[in-house]
Amino acid sequence: MISVELPLKRTKLVQAYHRWFADKPLASDSYKLVYHYHCKHLGPLKGVTRERKFTKLLDISIDEDKLMAAFGKTTRYEVRRAGNSDELQFGLVSNWETFLKYYNGFAALKEMPEMDPTILRSYWPHCVVTEACFEGQPLVMHTYVVDPVASRINLTYSATHFRGEVDRELRRKQGRANCWLHHQDMLHFKREGYACYDFGGYAFETTDKSLQAVNEFKDSFGGELVEESNYTSRALGWLRWVKSLR
């Protein structure tokens, strides 16, 4: 399990926490501002509110050829073509401000909220950011929350910049780069000794077409669909309720 301490804007007397990959919340967590991600326990618990969480998990400890063989035919083709023809370079992003700038540029294109730099700084010791570059410029970045003890990595953010919306070939190259980067990430973390690659979520039984497309993309890498639990502590739920009244 990892625990991320989040500073509150209005007071330093109380801290909020995000905890990841615990079996289940501690009883004492109900009196703290705690949100638990990806717990193994599947039932209700006293002092916390449960939310069902689905995700796709891949065993990356297996042989590399078997890992690739589990991919769908199209995904294998995209990964191989990108690796053989697209002149991509794999890299790690060591500076959180570099990722923040890239992600916020992506968010602006998608009309999404910008990332909070305070939260990113708190998470950074538990994050690994990878990139696929072409001619020295990043086409795709992936951010992972990593837990060495659990031997698990969780895809938290994926960001892509479309340089020139009319350039269809570049769009196709970026699509291949995204597939390729997922594969390179798996190989990188495998070499680092991790065993479980977590796609970060799965929109179970969704009727939303765009979310269905995301599910299909994740399905194309194989893996197992699993149910887990996110839990909100009683204290955090109460605080959110108070804020909703304002």
Residue ranges and their predicted role:
Residues M1-P44:
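N-terminal accessory interaction module
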Residues E165-F189:
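Conserved acetyl-CoA-binding loop-helix of GNAT-fold acetyltransferases
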Residues P125, G175-N178, L211:
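Active-site-proximal structural scaffolding
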